[in-house]
Amino acid sequence: MIREILQFGNPILREKSTEVTEFNKELHELLDDMYETMIDAEGIGLAAPQVGVLKRIVVIDIDDGKIELINPVITAMWGKQFEEEGCLSLVGKKGIVRRPMHVRVKAQNRFGKPVKYHGKELLARAFCHEIDHLNGILYEDKVIEWVEEEEDCE
């Protein structure tokens, strides 16, 4: 089921999410809904607070397959990159954000089993961006420079 994506200004987006302790059918439905919502919105990542659920849950797909992160923690990061980012909760705006080039993340999967990922470049940015959402941080807080959207010429 496609869910409504909360937009910038909604106070839920500034709240800290709580850990997931129950790995059950409701969690699986939420993960499936989040993924469907993200794909429908043509995004590459979505955090549970963006659909109004203050739980530490993230879905990501940068065209390498679905990644589900429950209770994610960044365990290491190195390097740096300055790239353009957007957000499904701040439609129509993009900005340059500094992020690490490499990120290691540990989390749990939908069944509560431990998982680890190493993301670089775009995946590293996606990990950082979505985990920021779980802490009430929006990418607009980190924008170095806003980027003008190009007008569609028809």
Enumerate the predicted regions with their spans.
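Positively charged
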Residues: 1-154
